[in-house]
Regions:
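Short, contiguous strand/loop micro-motifs
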Residues: 113, 134-136, 211-212, 261-263
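Active-site flanking residues adjacent to catalytic metal/cofactor-binding acidic residues
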Residues: 138, 162, 212, 238-239
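S-adenosyl-L-methionine-dependent methyltransferase catalytic module, highlighting the catalytic core
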Residues: 196-202, 206, 210-211, 219-308
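Conserved SAM-binding site of S-adenosyl-L-methionine-dependent methyltransferases, i.e.
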Residues: 215
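Conserved N-terminal segment of class I S-adenosyl-L-methionine
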Residues: 6-11, 15-17, 26, 34, ...
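Short, Lys/Arg-enriched N-terminal segments with co-localized hydrophobic residues
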Residues: 1-2
Length: 308
């Protein structure tokens, strides 16, 4: 009876996925057409990713159907239940249009993140403390939530993930974060709120604030840091793009169009001295650079630690 029930449940899950396939293919086609009309290199890359995810989804559905195709062999196959769970979970992952972070969901399934800060090794690169026991953590611009879940795993008693631009985007959305949180059985909280709307009254004050890959997207970076300072109780970890490394005084490059990575949402590339000055003007102290990567010409990525 138990074996039959398990098979029925899994078969129903497969049928549910198959019913969604037609709608998913339509959504894939609509999104692809919209991105192709945009015609930018960034959009072209997204089209390539969408195509890969669509192929993966079709492949997983086919593999799962084949798994149940021979009734006489199903009992033996059920002995390897994690393989079935992996197939079903992979199918869910493939339904998410765009993944930014690589998140280990278990069962051998890792989300296909394409972001520059998307691998587990970056926990060390940003200097995330080994233990966050008893601490509260705010992850600003969380996207898929990789760092939010990492903070939770390190013992944080409360983690709040916030985002607005990505989560409210019709082409990306919040699905990746919600899927990862459900599968990981995470208690991470979430709030859709813009950086410039952060305040102690709206979100509270946190021992540790993560501002990773966000600052250069801000049209008003100084105001953004003021808002971040207001909700920082102890420490800020800031990761950002920097430019004008050849300038020996505080300076920042301004990107009025698509100069940086052909992305119109990138606005400023301050050099390290400018970042330090901006953090100090917001009220932070004891500011230091803890990591530099992807250096190219006058540009790089840098991680700063600062305290209140």
């Amino acid at each position: 009876m138990m074996m039959t029930t398990t098979i029925e449940i899994l078969w129903q899950q497969l049928n549910d996925i198959k019913k969604q396939a037609a709608d998913l293919n339509l959504r894939f086609s609509q999104a692809t057409q919209k991105l192709q009309e945009d015609g930018t290199p960034f959009s072209e890359n997204l089209v390539k990713e969408l195509t890969i995810y669509r192929q993966d989804f079709d492949k997983i559905c086919t593999e799962t159907q084949q798994f149940f195709s021979s009734p006489q062999t199903v009992p033996a196959k059920i002995a390897s239940l994690p393989d079935i769970e992996r197939l079903l979970l992979t199918a869910e992952v493939a339904k998410i249009p765009v993944w930014h972070h690589c998140i280990d969901l278990g069962c051998g399934v890792i989300t296909p993140g394409g972001g520059k800060t998307s691998s587990p090794q970056t926990e060390q690169k940003i200097g995330l403390p080994e233990s966050l026991a008893g601490m509260t953590v705010l992850d600003v611009g969380a996207w898929d939530g990789f760092y939010s879940f990492a903070a939770e795993k390190r013992g944080a008693k409360r983690v709040l993930a916030t985002d607005s631009f990505v989560w409210q985007s019709p082409d990306v959305g919040k699905g990746g974060f919600e899927l990862a949180r459900r599968v990981l059985k995470s208690q991470v909280e979430d709030m859709e709120i813009d950086v410039l709307d952060l305040s102690p009254e709206k979100v509270g004050v946190f021992d540790l604030v993560l501002l990773l890959g966000v600052l250069y997207h801000m049209r008003h970076p100084l105001l953004a840091l003021d808002r971040v300072f207001s909700v920082t109780g102890k420490q800020l970890i800031l990761e950002t793009h920097v430019d004008m490394l050849d300038c020996q005084r505080p300076a920042a490059a301004f990107y009025s169009g698509r100069e940086l990575n052909n992305d119109p949402t990138n606005w400023f590339g301050p050099n390290p001295l400018a970042v330090k000055g901006m953090l100090e003007s917001a009220g932070f102290r004891d500011i230091k650079v803890v990591n530099t990567s992807q250096a190219s010409g006058t540009c790089a990525r840098m991680v700063f630690h600062a305290w209140r």
